[in-house]
Amino acid sequence: MITTILWDVDRTLLDFDAAERAAVQSLYIEFGLGECSEEALARYSAINRKYWEKMERGEITKQAVLEGRFQEFFSLHGLDPALAVPFNAAYQRNLGDTVCFYPYALETVQALRSHVLQFAAT
């Protein structure tokens, strides 16, 4: 009998990609950059993925990921790359505050609540 469930939250219960898009879109408005198109969001995701893969291979540091992804993205879109540092700081805050559940994820956790212990694991 199962008594405990350990959830790996990102990309199982929570839709990280949707949260990422929402965080970038809201910051575009907050920074007075207008609206961020779906095409631009797809480009950002590709750039972001490229930087994280470089870090995983040991080619760059985490700090280089956090700043470089937005510097490259802004340069590509004709925006001031100097915005990368404050934009990243605000992005980290917004991403942490943005919760996007996958369909039925919240209902599943709630349904299991009275039957098993549940923990988030990373």
Q: Model-predicted segments: where are they?
A:
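A short, charged/proline- and glycine-enriched loop
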Residues: M1-I2, H115
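N-terminal helical cap/lid subdomain that shapes the substrate entry/recognition surface
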Residues: I2-Y102
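Substrate-recognition element of Asp-dependent hydrolases with the DxDx(T/V) motif
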Residues: P86-N88, G96-C100, A105-T122
